[in-house]
Structures are given as structure tokens and as C-alpha cells.
């Protein structure tokens, strides 16, 4: 009789153990992988004049200002020099370098590199100029600036695609004493090297500029799921890479004045990731929205991240402050 009771007790205990194990194995069904570490991050991307770079592995950020017109240009320079006898000496250079560097928000330095008038080398010709936006183009202007042995005036425009058109008047004081000059010059060229930060010098995965977003050599796919846990495998499909854009808004000061307009810069954007949070400027005030979808970011190293934007404003209602959940790396 004792043996029978002992056998019943063993069987009953085993049954309880099986029930308990089955319950543990079923926990989390339908919620995705149990070992996923879902992190939350917030990026303040309200500034128009900078990119905020985000790193998935540690959630760190770094920011760098956008320089819309600074850099080295290459173009054609045509000039004429008035001579004492009333004639002109004309010349041109097809590969003339010109540099623009930022002094402050409203001032740049323009340097005509190694300028030659005929066989005479005049070295670098430089002047400071004011910079502003007019009809959505960057304008530069300097009037009778005395720089060493020169007096320089210039005015021109730089478009968002970084094509430059510049008129210059250079009075060389030594030539003026001999009734020569001024030198009248026109310059047309395009930027060949931007003054913006070299993005390959630091680690980052995605970046934010206002409502624009881009990747560091990666690509993005939008899923149809609205919960991170519901994306249980890395989906296949068309992962979209970044594209070049010359319509990054960096100056909104003249948005309501058609004679001023918006200041633009060149850059790259990922249209898929940017569409996760939208801002419609066709009417005022702007309309804001988000898709609630989960996005897959394939990084340059070949790893994957799941990301879902949960808000586009902070607790005070400031728009352009993005909160998102993400999993990285996706296992």
C-alpha cells in the first residue's frame, strides 16, 4: 500500500512539473524574441543649421553645423584690365580656384587663389563679404574693401546646387598710380570640396536634420508592422539607400517673404526613414504627422536595427524633438 501511495505522489509531482515548464515556455508568445533589448532615445533636431548624428551601439550623439556655401570652387575666370591708352588687356583662366570660408553667421571670406593677370602673378586676392538669402539663393557682397594693396568689390549668388556666379572689381593700388585698372572679372564655377565636416572621421549610424534623416552608408526598409516585437525576422525587400539633395533647409528667416525665401544646402537624405515623421509646409501653421511603422535600418557594417518613432515633440510641445524605440543589433 505504501508503494502505491509513493508512486501516486511521484506521478502527481511530475505532472505539476510538466505544467509549470509548459507555462514558462509559452510566456511571451506573440511578443517577439524574449531576449530583445528595446532601448529608447530622444534627439532634439529643431535646429536648421546642424546635423545630429546618432550611434546605435551606445546611444551617443554628436552634432556638427551645416556649411551651405563654404568650400573650394573650381571655375572659369574672365577678366579685363583697363590700360592707360584707353584699351583693355583681356584674359581668362579655365581652372581658377576660389575658396569661401565662414567668418560668422553673416560674413564669409572669399579668396581668389593664385590670381594671374597676363604673365604677372598677383598671388591670393581675398576679401570679406556679407552673406544673406535673396529669392532662395545665397548672395555675397563686398563694397570697396581695402585689403593690403588692393581695393575690392564683389557681388554674386550661390545656388543650392553650389553653382557660383560672381562679379569682381579689383583695384591694384600700384597699378592705379600708373593709370591702370581696375580689373573687372567674372567668375562662374561649382564647388568641388565642401567645408562641411568629414563624416568618415567619427562613428555614427543615422543622423537628423530638422525633419530630414540619413544613414551612414546604410539603407532602410519600411515594414507593415506597428510594433517592434511583431518584427520577428529581418524582412527581405527593397532597402533604399540615401540620395543626394540640394533642398536641405538651413535658413527659414525669409520663408514668408518671396524676395528673401528659404536658404538651402546640399546633402544626402534617406527618403524612407525621413517619411517616418513628416512636416507639411504647404499651409501655415505646418502639419505634423508620423507613420507609426517599424523601420529596418541596414548599417554600413551589415548589421540591422529595428526602429519605431513614437513622438515628434517633447513634453512642452516643441516639435522636432524625436523619441524612438530601437533594437540593435537584431539577432
Predicted regions: what they are:
Residues 17-20:
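C-terminal motif of bacterial Sec signal peptides marking the signal peptidase cleavage site
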Residues 136-155:
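An anionic, turn-rich surface loop/hairpin at beta-sheet edges
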Residues 1-5:
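Positively charged n-region of N-terminal signal peptides that target proteins for export
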Residues 157-160, 165-174:
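A composition-driven surface/loop motif
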Residues 96-101, 124-135, 153-160, 189:
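Extended lipid/amphipathic-ligand handling interfaces
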Residues 24-109, 142-147, 175-331:
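Surface-exposed, beta-sheet-biased, low-hydrophobicity segments with strongly acidic/polar composition
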Residues 6-11:
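Sec-dependent N-terminal signal peptides
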Amino acid at each position: 500500500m505504501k508503494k502505491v501511495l509513493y508512486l501516486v505522489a511521484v506521478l502527481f509531482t511530475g505532472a505539476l512539473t510538466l505544467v509549470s515548464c509548459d507555462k514558462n515556455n509559452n510566456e511571451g508568445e506573440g511578443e517577439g524574441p524574449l531576449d530583445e533589448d528595446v532601448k529608447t532615445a530622444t534627439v532634439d533636431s529643431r535646429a536648421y543649421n546642424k546635423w545630429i548624428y546618432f550611434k546605435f551601439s551606445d546611444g551617443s550623439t554628436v552634432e556638427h553645423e551645416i556649411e551651405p556655401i563654404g568650400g573650394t570652387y573650381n571655375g572659369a575666370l574672365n577678366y579685363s584690365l583697363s590700360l592707360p591708352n584707353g584699351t583693355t588687356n583681356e584674359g581668362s583662366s579655365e581652372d581658377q580656384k576660389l575658396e569661401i570660408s565662414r567668418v560668422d553667421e553673416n560674413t564669409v571670406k572669399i579668396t581668389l587663389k593664385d590670381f594671374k593677370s597676363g604673365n604677372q602673378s598677383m598671388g591670393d586676392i581675398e576679401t570679406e563679404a556679407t552673406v544673406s538669402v535673396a529669392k532662395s539663393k545665397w548672395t555675397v557682397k563686398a563694397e570697396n574693401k581695402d585689403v593690403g594693396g588692393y581695393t575690392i568689390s564683389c557681388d554674386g549668388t550661390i545656388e543650392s546646387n553650389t553653382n557660383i556666379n560672381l562679379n569682381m572689381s579689383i583695384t591694384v593700388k600700384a597699378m592705379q598710380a600708373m593709370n591702370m585698372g581696375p580689373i573687372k572679372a567674372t567668375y562662374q564655377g561649382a564647388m568641388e570640396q565642401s567645408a562641411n565636416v568629414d563624416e568618415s572621421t567619427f562613428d555614427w549610424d543615422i543622423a537628423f536634420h530638422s525633419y530630414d534623416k540619413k544613414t551612414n552608408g546604410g539603407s532602410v526598409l519600411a515594414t507593415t508592422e506597428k510594433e517592434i516585437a511583431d518584427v520577428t525576422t529581418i524582412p527581405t525587400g527593397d532597402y533604399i539607400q540615401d540620395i543626394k539633395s540640394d533642398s536641405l533647409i538651413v535658413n527659414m528667416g525669409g520663408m514668408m517673404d518671396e524676395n528673401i525665401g528659404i536658404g538651402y544646402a546640399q546633402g544626402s537624405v534617406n527618403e524612407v526613414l525621413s517619411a517616418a515623421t513628416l512636416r507639411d509646409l504647404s499651409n501655415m501653421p505646418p502639419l505634423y504627422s508620423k507613420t507609426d511603422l517599424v523601420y529596418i535600418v541596414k548599417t554600413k557594417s551589415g548589421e540591422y536595427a529595428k526602429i519605431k518613432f513614437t513622438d515628434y515633440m517633447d513634453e512642452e510641445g516643441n516639435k522636432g524633438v524625436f523619441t524612438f524605440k530601437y533594437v540593435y543589433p537584431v539577432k
